[in-house]
């Protein structure tokens, strides 16, 4: 019994030390949205998984021009609010805040994908370099795959309306078009291949959730035991490793870059990038899988948001269609043509402004203490993000931001000085869907052309609408992720003048 008072004293001392350390930590001087006291913050973290929209909106309204913090199950995230703060974050140097370290913390890449991809992200270099430079010659294959995919997955009959699952159909078409570039024929059409790459984001999410509730000291033990991603990586490797090795042999036989028999595609560029840093085939396999993880997940969501807006606002289909007919008759199905599709470009940008893939963006990890211009101190090791949804609905940046105005940005581009700033792929402190600054999404130029090709084909070939009352179904939120309805169907009817 004598030990009981000693135990009480020890608890009091430890509590006092904890509270003193907490008080001295500048993180806790930043206002919180949701409960912030020890243990109670976990209630806030759980609430965020279901009510992120409301919590982020509350924080943006209260703290615009400054910052607030949000509890996650395994950490606090500091969210910056407003264009001025967005610009401040993207200007911070890489030795102060890190994009790759933030990605590793968020996704736990070394456990959920592969350690070598975060250490040698060769796929990012390929997306930023040869993929972007070769968009024009790649487009013919992409368009061909889209045309075949649309015929297979939207099986219309005469002038009848047919009902097609929106998100699932767009995911199929995006996957085929992207992988026509990533892995080529016939693998891009292989059902087993599609099953593996479409399951992978869910496998990563399951592993990420388990690790988010795992104490830090146990992650090196629990992480390697997670079965889902490891199983998918094995399956993907079994399919792709022989193909990559065969491609390596082919490239050795055709060393001359001007040789017409030398493939010029994503796999070739990955192999060349891997050779430059002397990396094994396993890295190439994981880099291909990671490219699918990033490209297909985000592009499928973005194009589905745009499709749902076309179906919910059918009155805008004809103005876009008229522009498409005029441009394609003059330029053909080319990169130059896609650059002149201002109305379609604006429609896509407005869809992404109002219906992004995430309510936060420009995510970084502080490598050292960060002091903002307003004096707020963010300690080293903290994740920092900007409030993307708040930014995109800010009345200081957009007139009537809650109204879908599909030609908002094409109208802005009528001013010659604004033509580049308001393109779909352009980023700014007021538009952060692709991030902002030098770490903005490197694949957005490929994605822009791919999505324009898909939407152009749909608009030219079909009338589209929702059944019932015709209203767009509500989005589904998973934390800060914004997913278009996974159960909604879109009605398609073949147009009599289809086939341009």
Swiss-Prot record:
This protein's UniProt keywords:
Glycoprotein, Heme, Iron, Membrane, Metal-binding, Monooxygenase, Oxidoreductase, Transmembrane, Transmembrane helix
Q: Where are the transmembrane segments?
A: 1-21, 26-46
Provide the GO MF annotations for this entry. heme binding; iron ion binding; monooxygenase activity; oxidoreductase activity, acting on paired donors, with incorporation or reduction of molecular oxygen
Q: In which pathway does it act?
A: Secondary metabolite biosynthesis
- Please give the cofactor(s) recorded in the UniProt entry for this protein: heme
Q: What GO biological process terms are annotated to this protein in UniProt?
A: secondary metabolic process
How does this chain sit within the bilayer?
Answer: Multi-pass membrane protein
Q: What is its EC number?
A: 1.-.-.-
Q: Which residues bind heme?
A: 441
Q: Which Pfam families match?
A: p450 (PF00067)
Q: The organism sits in which domain of life? A: Eukaryota
Give the glycosylated residues: 374
The protein's predominant localisation is membrane
Q: What GO terms fall under cellular component here?
A: membrane
Q: Does the keyword Signal apply?
A: no
- Functional note: Cytochrome P450 monooxygenase that is able to use testosterone as a substrate for oxidation.
What is the name of the protein in this document? Cytochrome P450 monooxygenase 103
Q: Which organism is it from?
A: Postia placenta (strain ATCC 44394 / Madison 698-R) (Brown rot fungus)
């Amino acid at each position: 019994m004598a030990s009981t008072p000693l135990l009480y004293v020890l608890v009091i001392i430890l509590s006092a030390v904890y509270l003193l350390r907490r008080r001295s930590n500048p993180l806790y001087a930043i206002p919180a949205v949701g409960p912030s006291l020890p243990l109670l913050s976990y209630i806030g973290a759980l609430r965020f998984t279901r009510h992120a929209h409301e919590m982020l909106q509350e924080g943006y309204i209260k703290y615009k021009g400054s910052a607030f913090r949000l509890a996650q199950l395994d950490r606090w995230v500091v969210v910056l609010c407003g264009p001025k703060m967005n610009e401040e974050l993207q200007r911070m140097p890489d030795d102060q805040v890190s994009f790759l370290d933030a990605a590793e913390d968020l996704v736990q890449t070394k456990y959920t994908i592969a350690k070598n991809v975060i250490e040698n992200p060769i796929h990012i270099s390929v997306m930023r370099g040869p993929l972007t430079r070769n968009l024009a010659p790649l487009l013919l294959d992409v368009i061909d795959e889209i045309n075949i995919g649309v015929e297979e997955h939207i099986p219309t009959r005469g002038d009848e309306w047919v009902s097609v699952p929106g998100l699932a159909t767009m995911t199929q078409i995006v996957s085929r078009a992207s992988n026509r570039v990533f892995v080529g024929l016939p693998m891009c059409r292989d059902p087993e291949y599609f099953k593996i790459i479409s399951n992978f984001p869910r496998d990563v999410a399951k592993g990420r959730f388990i690790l988010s509730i795992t104490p830090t000291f146990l992650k090196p033990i629990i992480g390697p035991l997670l079965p889902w991603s490891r199983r998918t990586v094995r399956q993907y490797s079994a399919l792709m490793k022989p193909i990559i090795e065969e491609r390596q042999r082919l490239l050795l036989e055709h060393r001359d870059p001007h040789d017409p028999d030398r493939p010029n595609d994503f796999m070739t560029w990955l192999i060349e990038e891997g050779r430059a840093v002397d990396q094994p085939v396993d890295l190439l396999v994981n880099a291909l899988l990671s490219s699918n993880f990033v490209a297909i997940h985000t592009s499928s969501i973005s194009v589905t948001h745009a499709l749902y807006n076309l179906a919910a606002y059918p009155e805008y289909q004809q103005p876009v269609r008229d522009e498409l007919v005029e441009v394609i008759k003059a330029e053909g199905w080319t990169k130059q043509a896609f650059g002149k599709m201002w109305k379609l470009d604006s429609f896509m940008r407005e869809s992404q402004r109002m219906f992004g893939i995430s309510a936060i963006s420009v995510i970084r990890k502080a490598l050292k203490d960060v002091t903002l211009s307003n004096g707020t101190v963010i300690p080293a090791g903290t994740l920092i993000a900007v409030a993307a949804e708040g930014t995109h609905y800010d009345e200081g940046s957009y007139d009537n931001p809650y109204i879908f105005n599909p030609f908002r940005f094409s109208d802005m581009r009528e001013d010659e000085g604004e033509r580049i700033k308001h393109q779909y792929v352009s980023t700014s402190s007021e538009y952060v869907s692709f991030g902002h600054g030098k770490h903005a999404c490197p694949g957005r130029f490929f994605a822009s052309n791919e999505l324009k090709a898909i939407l152009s084909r749909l608009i030219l070939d079909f009338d589209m609408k929702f059944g019932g009352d015709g209203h767009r179904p509500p989005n589904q939120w998973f934390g800060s992720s914004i997913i278009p309805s996974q159960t909604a169907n879109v009605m398609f009817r073949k147009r009599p003048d289809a086939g341009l």
